[in-house]
Regions:
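H-loop/switch region of ABC-family ATPase nucleotide-binding domains
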Residues: 188-190
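Conserved ABC ATPase signature
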Residues: 128-132, 136
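ABC ATPase NBD coupling module
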Residues: 66-78, 86, 92
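Hydrophobic anchor residue at the start of the ABC signature
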Residues: 142, 154, 170
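A short, flexible loop at the N-terminus of ABC-type nucleotide-binding domains that lies
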Residues: 2-5, 9-22
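Q-loop/switch helix immediately C-terminal to the Walker
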Residues: 83, 90-106
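Helix-to-loop junction immediately C-terminal to a conserved catalytic motif
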Residues: 51
Length: 205
C-alpha cells in the first residue's frame, strides 16, 4: 500500500502558530520511514492526519490514490500512541480492546502467533486497562493495530515509556511482522539511533 501526504498544513485554531506548513511525505509499499523533529514541531499531529484522525487545513492524504478521509470500514493505516492509557476505553476488558481491531483472522493460529510474539498473557485478557502495567497495555494496543487488513503501521513514540528489555522484545517482533506481511511503517522517535535501526530512511520535519 502506498501512502502519500500532499502539501499538508495545519494549526490549532485562529491566532495559533502553524504546526505543519506544506508538508509532503510518501511511503512506498513495504517501506519504513522514520520522522524526527524537536518537541512541538507537529510529529504527533502529522501522524493523526496520516491516520485520518485529524483533517488538515489544506492538502490531502492518499492511500493507494484514495483520500484517507473517504475510506469506509477498517482503515489500513493504524496508529499506536505513546500513551496507551489514552487510546483505550477504561471500562472495557482487554479482550474487547483486541476485538476493536480487525482480528477476524481466518486461521485462529494467526491471532495466537501475534499474542505470543508480543508476550500477551491469556490471564490479562479478562482484566481492565487499569489492572495491567503500561508495558502490558501497550502490547495489547500494538496487537490491536496489527489487524489482518492493516497495511501501514504508525508508531508514534511506541516504546518510549517502556524499559529497554521490553522495547527490544517489541521492536524485534514488530520488525519481523512488517517483513512477514510486507507492511509499511512510519516511526516517530527522538532517538536517531532507534530510527536508523528500524527504518529504511529518516525524514526531519
Amino acid at each position: 500500500m502506498r501512502l502519500e501526504a500532499r502539501d499538508i498544513s495545519f494549526k490549532y485554531g485562529k491566532g495559533t502558530r502553524q504546526i505543519l506548513d506544506h508538508v509532503n511525505l510518501t511511503v512506498e509499499p513495504g517501506e519504513s520511514v522514520g520522522i524526527m523533529a524537536p518537541s512541538g514541531y507537529g510529529k504527533t499531529t502529522l501522524c493523526k492526519i496520516l491516520a485520518g484522525y485529524e483533517r488538515p487545513d489544506s492538502g490531502e492524504v492518499l492511500v493507494d490514490g484514495m483520500p484517507v478521509l473517504e475510506l469506509r470500514g477498517y482503515c489500513p493505516v493504524q496508529m499506536v500512541w505513546q500513551h496507551p492509557e489514552l487510546s483505550v476505553n477504561p471500562k472495557r476488558r482487554l479482550s474487547t480492546v483486541l476485538e476493536e481491531g480487525d482480528w477476524t483472522f481466518e486461521n485462529p493460529s494467526e491471532r495466537a502467533r501475534i499474542d505470543a510474539g508480543l508476550g500477551i498473557r491469556d490471564d490479562c485478557k479478562d482484566r481492565f486497562p487499569v489492572e495491567v502495567s503500561g508495558g502490558e497495555l501497550q502490547r495489547f494496543c500494538i496487537a490491536r493495530a496489527l489487524g489482518r487488513r492493516t497495511e501501514l503501521l504508525i508508531a508514534d513514540e511506541m516504546t518510549t515509556m517502556l524499559d529497554l528489555i521490553t522495547q527490544g522484545q517489541i521492536w524485534d517482533f514488530v520488525l519481523k511482522e512488517l517483513k512477514r506481511r510486507e507492511m509499511g511503517m512510519i516511526a516517530v522517535s527522538h532517538s536517531p539511533e532507534l530510527l536508523e535501526k528500524v527504518c529504511d530512511r529518516v525524514v526531519r520535519l
